[in-house]
Amino acid sequence: MRSRILAVGAVIALLTVACGNAGSDKNGSVPQTTKPGTPPITEVTGADLKKNVPLSGVQGVTDDEIKVAVITAGSNPLAGDYTTYKDGIQAYFNMINEQGGIYGRKLVISSDRNDGFVNNQQTVKTSLAQDHAFATFIASPLFYGANDIANSKPQMPTFIWNINQEFAGKPNIFGNVGALCFSCTGQGLPYLAKSQGFTKVAVLAYGSPAASKNCAAGAKAGFEKYPSAQVVYFDDNMRLGQPDLSAQVSAMKDKGVQLITTCVDQAETLILAKELAKQHLDAVQNLPNSYDPKFAADNAQYFEGSFVAPQFASFEYKPLLPTQEQFIEWMGKLNKRVFEIPAYGWINALQLVHGLKLAGPEFSQQKLIDSLNQDTAFDAEGMIPPIDWTRQHNDPAGPNGTTNTEVSGKYICASTVTIHDGKFVPLDDVPEGKQFICMTGGANSPTLTETPEYMRFGPS
């Protein structure tokens, strides 16, 4: 049941948020463009954004509202409250609604459902049958309802926090990143080890589910292809929720491990961190899905020097983008915390509105889907590396751990930070004004990046 969050730990935790070719625009300014060969499409602006055209037969739309449904894993045994995804959506909607909405209509969350972690498919089916929303937002480790979304009639525009392999191949489902590669061999961990001077690495994973073992195998393969450090300890047979890691830590201490990459959940990383402290092993972790200031502060003594990389520009890299400042402001107005999961809600709410602006005042669900699928550089106003929706709905996995660059993204970037005194701090090597560390040489580069490109995708 924990498979998605485990797999994504390997895919996105360090410099592997997108499979593809590293970009060459060092300024990072990427205009939104249109699929070659199609009529140009641009966002509606000015007075047209206020134009209220009566729409007949468009599901979830009235003369004064655009209704959306939200599905999250509220009853979630993994660390992190997925219901906070809705907070980011609501914050963005509040900002747009205060400006008068779009096309004379307010954006409204009309349904909020908890899929109970294991009931995603049934919850999706119920929402599709009963909520009659214009669009759906989903954040759940298990996306078993993906095929129901893909086969919905009318096609349901759906926006997810993408940590799910079920995302791939469904053109009406959009995410904060494109389709992820769950088997590609990446430069991320080897580059991290090299840049930080680590030479001895450990990899930990559960024996079941298979995704955890695959994650560990991918991490190990990365160091075999790019041998910046040696994997001196490897255990992919841990038990789910294993409470005692004393044997593993003792073995790692004997091997002189400096960096630990894990394919386990957040709760397990804390168990590991406490055991590291108990045995006085001065090793740091690569932490998946842990960009949460409260988690870092509450466990400051255990995670000093560990690394975290959200799927967006970390707020520690200044100056902040205008949309980052807006996110902080409008989350504050909701009296909600600023951290990783709500930020994905904000990004995807922005993407919905972007799609509406592309579709125009006479919008429909299908027009919104078609419009977004012409966008070759959606970057959420700079918060994420640009997504090419003409390519990145497709699974980028190639044979033998390679990436199919015909359908992968252009950039291999992450916005990695480290934990110091219970706070996230930027890496020293990143120049002021840049927010992302990007690999060079392409997704299938035969050699490890020597000098990365430091990029910023939004305005300075």
Briefly describe each language-model feature range:
Residues 1-11:
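N-terminal export and membrane-targeting signals
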Residues 333-342, 354-428, 433:
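Segments of small-molecule ligand-sensing domains
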Residues 54, 80-87, 98-171, 236-246, ...:
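Beta-alpha junction/loop-to-helix N-cap segments that form part of ligand/metal-binding clefts
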Residues 19-29:
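Bacterial lipoprotein signal-peptidase II cleavage site
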Residues 53, 133-235, 284-308:
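Extracytoplasmic ligand/sensor domains, especially the bilobed periplasmic-binding protein
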Residues 178-180, 275-346, 358, 450-458:
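Extracellular/periplasmic periplasmic-binding protein-like sensory domains
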Residues 43-65, 69-90, 112-118, 206-215, ...:
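Extracytoplasmic "Venus flytrap"
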